[in-house]
């Protein structure tokens, strides 16, 4: 691409300036405090209902102390990839404990959750293979599929009939991989895993579940979607992240030992990326210990989720088919979604706007996410303010 063509392409990207000119830009908002149920923005108190810290562990003093201890012992970074000089004993310890949690033989760490999908999908599948994706799968799954050069086929969201129909048309001798979110990050619903494993068995397809938003939320001890349904043995690969329930940064993939060994020596996002920092690993280890040994965190998360969902539904909000602490509040208009987000922040409530192309414009929404550490009073305050702002915006469900 010539320099002129690149400049021309960039010149057409004007949505940011349009939103800023209207005072509606809602991204890259700088937070001046710890990621808690209340944060400071522009020196003002704001209720945080946009965080993925489902268990509220990012401010747990035990986790902070574990990170500080790791900094003192190992330093700030590993200065290399896992493949070469960047493997610490605590990396291996964390992999072992994650394998135990999700019920798989082995696991491999990645430096980010995004890389945890990018590496495995791109190296396990090839040009003559087929990858089947839910149309609402995460961007990292889509990008990993593109990098594999496989033939990518999307099926309707959580539509098992469509998945079966798409698989039925593929050559029986070809390699096939189904990749799905466990809990979908925008809609908050859970994959129909029982039906999916039947279809995967029927068509000899491998199955990978992205548990980024499921780990610490569902399943025994927070082990995720496969555990939630009692189908661990039927899922070939389980992916998870540490930036949500586990209060850190990074990710992993777990599966059979031979598959994980293959990934260690072929997944580029392991071989050519610096490994997780010592502080991140230690934080994850301590958060994992707390998640398993203190079930009250998950219990509180679900108490808050059920309470907030009840309050929102009784107030007339459209929540779609959510089954999780991710409560999508549908507005179904891009500009109104930005307006509501801005007005809520001005009124002391932080939520995340989700608009096209992340979702179709007629399904635009704000994502209202619960934490175990929210109080009912905080939820009540947020709902009261949302009712007022939605009525000002003339959102149809609340008029």
Swiss-Prot record:
Cofactor(s) in the UniProt record? pyridoxal 5'-phosphate
Modified residue N6-(pyridoxal phosphate)lysine is at which positions? 244
The keyword Transferase is assigned to this record: yes
Q: Which UniProt keywords apply?
A: Acyltransferase, Cytoplasm, Lipid metabolism, Pyridoxal phosphate, Transferase
What are the annotated GO cellular component locations?
cytoplasm; membrane
The portions of this protein that span the membrane are none
CDD domains to which the protein is assigned, alphabetical: KBL_like
Activity's dependence on pH: Optimum pH is 7.0 to 8.0.
Q: In which pathway does it act?
A: Lipid metabolism; sphingolipid metabolism
Q: Name one GO molecular function term.
A: serine C-palmitoyltransferase activity
Which reaction does this enzyme catalyse, per its entry? L-serine + hexadecanoyl-CoA + H(+) = 3-oxosphinganine + CO2 + CoA
- The signal peptide stretch is none
Under InterPro entries, the record lists: Aminotrans_II_pyridoxalP_BS, Aminotransferase_I/II_large, AON_synthase_class-II, PyrdxlP-dep_Trfase, PyrdxlP-dep_Trfase_major, PyrdxlP-dep_Trfase_small
Predominant location category: cytoplasm
> Where found in the cell?
Cytoplasm
Transferase as a keyword of this entry, yes or no, is yes
Please list the GO biological process terms of this entry.
Answer: biosynthetic process; sphingolipid metabolic process
Enzyme Commission numbers on file? 2.3.1.50
Family, similarity comment: Belongs to the class-II pyridoxal-phosphate-dependent aminotransferase family.
What role does this protein play?
Catalyzes the condensation of L-serine with palmitoyl-CoA (hexadecanoyl-CoA) to produce 3-oxosphinganine.
- Identify this protein by name: Serine palmitoyltransferase
The organism of origin for this protein: Sphingobacterium spiritivorum (Flavobacterium spiritivorum)
Gene symbol here is spt
